[in-house]
């Protein structure tokens, strides 16, 4: 499959692009897209190199996203410079108001990268150790052996609140808060199936709901305020924020594949595992800040981008808030996908080749996760497309 795609994309480059499209792309008159203000130092690519990446990205969009009815935003960057930027569809299908570069999307599980790196910032600043037991920070949390690190790398053994609270009789007429998740774990410990800490990897939203509470306890600030003052404002991420219930009627809605609006549910209050809204350009600023080392020491990033789960053979792994592809030649893909209601998201960083792929959608569309088919344009990356997760 990958070889066939590579051949297709090469043909598209030679022909100057496979399809004409009336969809809006953001490119200046010189054929070079602009770098977001505040993004940091980005190199200017030679025109031939820029054109190559633009045509490959456009061909990917026309071959995979456009035929699937994609409704969202796509951005591809090389060395911090945007080589392709595309906004397709509507904020609301009822009003048919067009999406644009300032439209914040629900990031779903891509939000975990901010939660995890916020914890890493507290660690770097000496406010906590990732080897600290969670009970040190969360009163009543009597689960020995569960550390901050096992929450970060999904090796805690805890059950997923998204499923287990309903199974144990939670009244869905009452919205779940982060504190409710903690209280539920404390009060129902004897009724829950809990794995041995650090025994194996199990992706679990509970981990990041608890990490948000750890951030609040250690920093003395609300989660949204800590992220705003530590990341969003310093990096110029003006269209990025944490959802709150009072924003329900003003944030971008999501839709199922039939274009039917997805309702908010009792699970939509919890943050840390989800509930950050952002744009493709703001995520590029986040990527550049991580890449340039402006906010983290190299050793912190090395720990975040290291794998911690080796029970299964293969290149897939998970770091401290990042999904990873760790290749035998030491190349790695650092990324996170997301899925919540009708929101599908991809945030991929090809750190060895200084390339970034960001796709955000608010109408359910699994073809968004075919983004990995683009990666071979930037380097030697093998394997099938990366699937989505919640």
What do the predicted segments below correspond to?
Residues 65-73, 95-151, 193-204, 271-272, ...:
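Short active-site loop at a secondary-structure junction
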Residues 18-87, 216, 228, 233, ...:
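Catalytic loop of the DD-peptidase/beta-lactamase superfamily, centered on the K-T-G motif
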Residues 79-81, 91-93, 156-157, 247, ...:
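Solvent-exposed coil/turn segments that connect beta secondary-structure elements
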Residues 1-28:
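Bacterial Sec-dependent N-terminal signal peptides
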Residues 146-341:
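Short, surface-exposed loop or secondary-structure junction motifs
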Residues 42-46, 92, 131-140, 164-170, ...:
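Short linear capping/connector segments at secondary-structure termini
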Residues 78, 82, 134, 140, ...:
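Short, solvent-exposed turn/loop segments enriched in Gly/Ser/Thr/Pro and often Arg
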Residues 44, 87, 98, 106, ...:
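Conserved beta-strand positions that form and line the central face of beta-propeller blades
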């Amino acid at each position: 499959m990958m070889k066939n795609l590579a051949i297709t994309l090469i043909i598209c480059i030679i022909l100057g692009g496979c399809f004409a499209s009336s969809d809006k792309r953001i490119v200046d008159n010189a054929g070079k897209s602009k770098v977001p203000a505040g993004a940091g130092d980005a190199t200017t690519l030679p025109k031939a190199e820029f054109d190559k990446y633009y045509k490959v990205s456009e061909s990917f969009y026309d071959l995979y996203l456009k035929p699937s009815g994609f409704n969202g935003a796509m951005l591809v960057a090389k060395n911090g410079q945007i080589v392709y930027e595309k906004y397709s569809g509507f904020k609301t299908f009822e009003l048919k108001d067009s999406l644009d570069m300032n439209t914040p999307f629900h990031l779903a599980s891509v939000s975990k990268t901010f939660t995890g790196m916020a914890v890493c910032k507290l660690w770097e600043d000496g406010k906590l150790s990732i080897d600290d037991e969670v009970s040190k920070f969360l009163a009543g949390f009597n689960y020995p052996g569960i550390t901050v690190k096992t929450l970060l790398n999904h090796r805690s053994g805890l059950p997923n609140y998204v499923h287990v609270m309903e199974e144990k009789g939670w009244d869905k007429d009452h919205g779940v808060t982060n504190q409710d998740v903690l209280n539920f774990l404390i009060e129902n410990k004897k009724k829950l199936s809990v794995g041995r800490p650090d025994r194996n990897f199990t992706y679990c939203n509970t981990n990041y709901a608890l990490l948000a509470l750890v951030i609040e306890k250690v920093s003395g600030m609300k989660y949204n305020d800590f992220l705003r003052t530590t990341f969003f404002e310093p990096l110029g991420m003006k269209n990025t924020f944490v959802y709150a219930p009072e924003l329900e009627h003003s944030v971008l809605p999501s839709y199922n594949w039939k274009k039917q609006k997805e309702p908010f549910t009792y699970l939509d209050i919890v943050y840390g595992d989800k509930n950050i809204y952002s744009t493709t350009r703001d995520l590029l600023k986040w990527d550049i800040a991580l890449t340039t080392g402006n906010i983290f020491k190299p050793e912190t990033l090395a720990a975040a981008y290291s794998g911690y789960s080796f029970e299964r053979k293969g290149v897939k792994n998970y770091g401290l808030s990042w999904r990873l592809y760790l290749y035998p030649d030491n190349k790695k893909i650092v990324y996170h996908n997301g899925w919540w209601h009708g929101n599908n998201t991809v945030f991929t960083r090809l750190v060895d080749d200084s390339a970034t792929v960001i796709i955000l959608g608010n109408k359910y569309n699994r073809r968004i996760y075919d983004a990995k088919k683009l990666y071979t344009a930037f380097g030697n990356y093998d394997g099938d497309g990366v699937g989505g997760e919640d």
